[in-house]
Design a protein with these regions (language model features):
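A short, active-site helix/loop in glycosyltransferases that binds the activated sugar's phosphate group
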Residues: 133-158, 165
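Conserved acidic donor-binding segment of nucleotide-sugar-dependent glycosyltransferases
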Residues: 291-303, 310-315
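N-terminal strand-loop element at the rim of the active site
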Residues: 6-62, 221-223
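A conserved mid-protein helix/loop that constitutes part of the nucleotide-sugar donor-binding site
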Residues: 14-25, 182, 186-205, 217, ...
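Short hydrophobic beta-strand element within catalytic cores of glycosyltransferases
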Residues: 276-279
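Short His-centered aromatic/hydrophobic patch
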Residues: 81-87, 107
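Aromatic "clamp/platform" in nucleotide-sugar-dependent glycosyltransferases that forms part
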Residues: 240, 259
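Acidic anion/phosphate-binding donor-loop and adjacent secondary structure
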Residues: 149, 157-181
Length: 347
């Protein structure tokens, strides 16, 4: 039996973790033995229980000895190292335990802000190391491949494998809105790279003019103190939400304010629900929305507000949204992603 070892920082509710969760299920259904090693996470992480249904999960900070045991027992396994921390640990443990696993890098980052000098400097190290180790590399986005090639990453064996629709969504029985009244939707944890400052500024311009609308925020890390006083009555903070389809389905629009991204899953999720999207270009958002008729990328906050106001003043007909959703559901089928991973890892 083929064995695949995943090494990832945590199993929290992020884009990479969502893709991992779905891949673990698909590989398990195709008789691939797997072990997931969570470097910093714990059993309460958002995706831990779901992943544990299909394979063994090792929490490093609970029992590091199990990591050694796995590396020694599965010397011929392939290691899929997720993100930079996973990459570092994979090579560190392979050297420490003197084993021969084949390591594949899974790079999720596609852009960096000007102030991220340390991160950019680190890329030079990773680029040099990738050439020395001649590691195979999977990029989650075309933008990620482009950026890393600038830093001299090994090109011998690499591929861009986009996430598509990684999360299993229940697209039926969404007739009842989970939110009272009309709303604009933002989905994402509180993180400076995801543009919370942009979101608040846009909301301050838009919501006072539209008192019947609210801003609904779903994602971890948001607190009431982060919302300006004049917006508190028109803002709803939900935290992490498991059943997100009703939120997408009944939203007037999804707003996407990120500065940097890899492959933003929220855009795909919104598309398969037929939700209009207004956003800035980040990561692979242009390629994701290229064939989605209800997606609008803008260059300024002024244009952002104008697009949202148009959707508020002239809401799209349900039939238009349903047609766009059906097309997107076919276009973003995760089976294509799984097959690409399988063929790359087990050629």
């Amino acid at each position: 039996m083929k064995t695949l070892i995943h090494i990832i920082p945590t199993l929290e509710n992020g884009g990479a973790e969502t893709v991992l969760t779905r891949l673990v299920e698909e590989f398990a259904n195709n008789d691939i033995e797997q072990i997931v090693i969570s470097i910093q996470g714990n059993a309460n992480d958002f995706n831990h229980a779901q992943i544990a249904r299909y394979c063994k999960v090792i929490i490093v900070k609970e029992d590091f000895y199990l990591v050694k045991k796995v590396f020694k027992a599965y010397t011929q396994a392939t290691v899929l190292a997720w993100m930079y921390k996973g990459i570092l640990k994979a090579h560190q443990w392979k050297s420490k335990f003197n084993t021969q696993q084949n390591i594949i890098w899974n790079i999720r980052r596609s852009s960096f802000r000007p102030k991220e000098v340390y991160q950019k400097t680190s890329l030079l190290f990773f680029g040099l190391f990738s050439k020395i180790a001649r590691t195979p590399i999977i990029y989650c986005a075309y933008q990620a491949e482009k950026i890393h090639n600038r830093y001299g990453f090994h090109k011998g064996k690499s591929a861009v494998i986009q996430n598509r629709l990684a999360k299993k969504l229940q697209l039926n029985n969404v007739n009842i809105s989970p939110i009272e009244g009309k709303y604009i939707l933002y989905i994402g944890r509180y993180n400076h790279a995801k543009g919370p400052d942009r979101l608040v500024e846009i909301a301050q311009k838009l919501l006072p003019k539209n008192p019947l609308y609210s801003l609904v925020i779903a994602g971890s890390g948001w607190t009431n103190e982060m919302i300006p006083y004049n917006l508190k009555e028109q803002t709803v903070l939900l935290g992490n939400v498991k059943e997100i389809v009703p939120l997408y389905t009944h939203a007037t629009a999804l707003v996407f304010t990120s500065y940097t991204e890899g492959y933003p899953n929220v855009l795909v999720e919104a598309a398969v629900c037929g939700t209009p999207i207004v956003g800035f270009a980040a990561g692979d958002s242009p390629s994701i929305l290229a064939d989605y008729s209800l997606g609008n990328l803008v260059a300024s906050k002024q244009d952002f507000c104008a697009q949202l106001q148009q959707l508020i003043d002239q809401p799209l007909a349900p039939k238009v949204r349903e047609t766009a959703a059906k097309k997107a559901l076919h276009h973003f089928d995760f089976k294509q992603t799984y097959q690409a991973y399988h063929d790359f890892i087990f050629p």
